[in-house]
Structures are given as structure tokens and as C-alpha cells.
Design a protein with these regions (language model features):
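Membrane-water interface regions at transmembrane-helix termini and the short interhelical loops
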Residues: 54-56, 83, 99, 107, ...
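C-terminal membrane-solvent junction of multi-pass transporters and transport-like membrane proteins
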Residues: 384-461
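Membrane-interface "cap" regions at the ends of multi-pass membrane proteins
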Residues: 1-61, 196, 218, 222-235, ...
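Hydrophobic transmembrane alpha-helices that form the core helical bundles
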Residues: 105-144, 321-337
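Transmembrane alpha-helical segments of multi-pass small-molecule transport proteins
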Residues: 36, 109, 137-169, 183-193, ...
Length: 461
């Protein structure tokens, strides 16, 4: 009975985990416009926008930093990830397995899946802050690491179960859900900004500039928070999705695209989500701080509800949902690379359970900026290996892929990963929080892979 129920849900889902996407399964532009708009106009926006306010960024630094950083992110998706995805039409995980060997990629896939679980978990927690409003749940604060009440745990687990139910149905359902929800959420964010500005006393263009500079983004961090500058904003907006574009995780999504140019459609997500929505949620947080002076409570649901009422709370629920859905889907595909004989939907269901448990801990939300930086630092190096392998082979340098020589553990790739990660964390430690400096190590990693290819080619002469 139970198996029949799940078979009915997942149907004949085929996610092509180890084969190229056939032509009849390719998706048009609408699918990607909706999914990226939904994913990036989502739960993280209700966290990141307020955290910029808390870190004391100025209004001018925020606007200019977001314009530059988001442009760099779109170019990374369009010029790096898109061409590789539509050329190979394979998942990130299977491509890495072919290059680096099954045994090495198993460890990478495990780390990748855990990172995705934690990110999706933070979004489930964001949704739970809104679901808990009618039940008067005690909400987490900026310093909380552990859940405060059993009610919070129950709310999170229920949200996680519902979100997982959509994710196990595969890419089609994930994309369909985002297409339905994203237009409404975008309008809610815009409405939030307008209503919030009115509550802060904005009546004209002059008062808008004054309120933005003196009330919302006044350049003064909250107690216990570090100071952010324009460089933090540029590099964070560029690299907050580094694992997706430079780290190549979105090969898994863009392999369905009819054209490599669909990678540029991410502009809909990043400029609506990582520009409009971050600004709007920052305005909401400023309204919340004005009404609750000195409050350390940090609950996106409460923040949105105070300004927009029920519509704001519902938007937070849906926003967390539209981010968690594709993230759990990606995590399921990562683990499917470790357990290739297990159906993806079963693995995704297990991932959803792990994610829901992780979501019970508010620290995932409170430390989201740090987590996103760590997430990118850990997952980016293997993207450099795929990038180097693709472009070197395209330019006549034969690639030494593990699958061709039946190598289970490509030592050179492991060394590249170790050198790159060590260099990254060395910089981060030396600068005490320099989380946005991964470009140089990516070059180091690519050069290491190039050297390995040349060395192997010479040894065959």
C-alpha cells in the first residue's frame, strides 16, 4: 500500500542521472525564467537583506555593490556554466565521476549533499517563522543556536515533510511550483518596499534618500555585528551562489536547457531577488527595528507580518518553500551519485528528512552569510576541474578521464582540491572573515589540472 502511494506520486520520473538529457525532455525558456525567479526571489532574501542592515552597510554601497556583483554573477552563469551544461547534458556529479573517479567523487558528493541539506534547512526554518505566527510560537533571536520550544520543532518538521513531498516528484514539479508562485512573490516584495517606506515616513524623493541614508542603511552596525563595505556587497552578491555557477552545480539544472544562452536568464532571479528583494527585506527590517527598539529577535515571518499582515506571512512561507524545493532536489542527485542503484526519489525523501532535522536549529538562519561563504569555498574547486577539463579538451588537449582508464581515485584531482581548499581557508583565516576571495584559488586549481593533463600527455609520448 505504501509503495503504491509513493509510486503514484513519483510516477515514471526519470531524472537521467547517468545519461545525457534526450532532445524530447529539453525545457524552454519559460521553465528557466520561472524557476530562477522563484529560487532567487525566495526565503534567503528575507534573511540576507536584514543582515545587511544589521552589518551597517551604507545605502550607496548597497546599491552600487548589488548592481556590480549581480552582473558578474549573471555573466558567470551565462558564459561559464551554460555552455558546458548544454554541451554535455550530464549532471555535475556524473561528470566529476568520469573525470576524478568514483571513490573521490563519493566524498565530494557527500559534502555537496550536506551543504545543500543545510541550505534547504535554513529555508524551511524561514518558512516556519511565518507558520508559527498563529500559534504564538517563541521565535529565535540573532544569538540562538538551539531550538527554544517543542512547538518550533514540530512546525519545522511538518513544513519539511510538505516541501519534500514536492521535491521527490522531480524537476518537472519543482519547476512547475516555482512558475506558479514566483510572479506573486515578486509583487509582494515590491509591495513590501512601498508599504515599509510609507511607514518610515517617506513622502517624496527627497525624503526617500534621507530615510535610506539615515534610517535604513545608515552605516552603523548593530551591537555585536561587523561592519560591511561595498566590497563585501560586490563579492557576496557575486559569490553567494558561487557553488551554482563557478562551482558548476547548476549543470544539473541547465542540462535541460534548449540553448546555452538560457544561463543568462538567471538575471531575472538575481536582479529581482538579489536586488529588489534584498532591498525590500532590508526596508522591512528597518520598520521592525523602529517598532521594536533594541530587539534581538530575528524571525523573517514576524518581520514581514508586521508590515504586510497575512500576505507577508504567506509570502515568507512560499519563499522558503521555493528555495528549499530545488535545493533538496540537488542534494538528492548528489547522493544518487553515491548510491546509483537506489531511485532518486527515495534518496530525495531521505535527504528531506535530514534537512528537516537540521532546520530545527536556528543557527542555520542566524549564520547564513557565514554558511553561504563556507558553502562556496568547499564546493567551488571541483567546478574548476570541470571547467579546465572542458575547455582544454575543446582546444585540442586530450583529457585524462578516470572513466577511460578505470581509475577509482584520481590523485591529481584530490591534490588540486586539497591545495585549493587550503589556500582558500588560509586567506580566510589570515583576513579574519575574508569570505569573498575565491577567484585566485580557482585559477590555481585550473592550472594544477592543466599541468596534470600536460604531464600525462607527455608521459604517453
Amino acid at each position: 500500500m505504501e509503495n503504491r502511494f509513493f509510486k503514484k506520486i513519483v510516477g515514471g520520473t526519470n531524472e537521467y542521472e547517468r545519461t545525457p538529457i534526450p532532445a524530447e525532455s529539453l525545457k524552454g525558456r519559460k521553465s528557466f525564467l520561472g524557476m530562477y525567479a522563484g529560487e532567487h526571489t525566495a526565503g534567503t532574501e528575507f534573511v540576507i537583506g536584514p543582515l545587511f542592515v544589521a552589518h551597517g552597510v551604507t545605502a550607496s554601497d548597497l546599491i552600487l555593490g548589488l548592481l556590480i556583483g549581480n552582473l558578474l554573477a549573471v555573466l558567470s552563469w551565462g558564459l561559464i556554466t551554460g555552455p558546458i551544461a548544454t554541451s554535455k547534458r550530464l549532471t555535475l556529479y556524473y561528470q566529476l565521476e568520469r573525470i576524478a573517479g568514483k571513490n573521490l567523487v563519493r566524498w565530494y558528493n557527500l559534502v555537496n549533499a550536506l551543504m545543500f541539506c543545510f541550505l534547504a534547512g535554513s529555508m524551511i526554518a524561514v518558512s516556519a517563522t511565518a507558520v508559527g505566527i498563529p500559534f504564538d510560537l517563541e521565535m529565535p533571536t540573532l544569538s540562538d543556536w538551539l531550538p527554544r520550544t517543542p512547538g518550533w520543532i514540530v512546525t519545522v518538521l511538518v513544513m519539511g515533510a510538505v516541501i519534500t513531498l514536492v521535491a521527490i516528484q522531480g524537476y518537472n514539479q519543482v519547476s512547475k511550483f516555482a512558475n506558479i508562485m514566483s510572479p506573486w512573490m515578486i509583487l509582494i516584495f515590491i509591495a513590501a518596499a512601498i508599504v515599509g517606506l510609507a511607514q518610515l515616513g517617506v513622502r517624496s524623493a527627497e525624503s526617500l534618500i534621507s530615510v535610506a541614508q539615515e534610517v535604513i542603511w545608515n552605516g552603523v552596525p548593530l551591537a555585536g555585528m561587523s561592519k560591511f563595505t561595498i566590497w563585501h556587497i560586490i563579492f557576496f552578491s557575486w559569490f553567494c551562489n558561487m557553488a551554482m555557477h563557478i562551482g558548476m552545480s547548476d549543470l544539473t539544472i541547465l542540462r535541460y536547457a534548449k540553448s546555452w544562452k538560457y544561463g543568462f536568464y538567471t538575471f531575472v532571479g538575481v536582479y529581482l531577488g538579489h536586488f529588489v528583494a534584498w532591498i525590500a527585506s532590508g526596508i522591512l527590517y528597518a520598520v521592525f527595528l523602529q517598532a521594536n527598539s533594541g530587539s534581538q529577535e530575528f524571525a523573517p515571518g514576524q518581520i514581514a507580518y508586521q508590515t504586510l499582515g497575512i500576505a507577508g506571512a504567506v509570502c515568507v512561507v512560499i519563499a522558503g518553500w521555493t528555495t528549499a524545493n530545488p535545493t533538496i532536489y540537488r542534494a538528492g542527485l548528489a547522493l544518487q551519485g553515491i548510491f546509483p542503484k537506489v531511485p532518486t526519489w527515495k534518496i530525495t525523501a531521505i535527504v528531506g528528512g535530514i534537512t528537516s532535522l537540521a532546520a530545527c536549529f536556528p543557527a542555520l538562519v542566524m549564520k547564513l552569510l557565514d554558511f553561504v561563504a563556507l558553502y562556496g569555498l568547499l564546493l567551488m574547486p571541483m567546478g574548476a576541474v570541470i571547467f579546465a577539463d572542458f575547455y582544454f579538451s575543446e582546444n585540442g588537449l586530450p583529457a585524462r578521464r578516470s572513466i577511460e582508464f578505470e581509475i577509482g581515485f584520481q590523485l591529481a584531482c584530490f591534490a588540486e582540491l586539497g591545495i585549493d581548499s587550503g589556500f582558500l581557508f588560509g586567506i580566510k583565516s589570515a583576513l579574519r572573515g575574508g569570505n569573498f576571495l575565491p577567484r585566485t584559488p580557482r585559477l590555481v586549481c585550473g592550472c594544477c589540472h592543466f599541468r596534470n593533463c600536460v604531464q600525462n600527455e607527455v608521459s604517453d609520448l
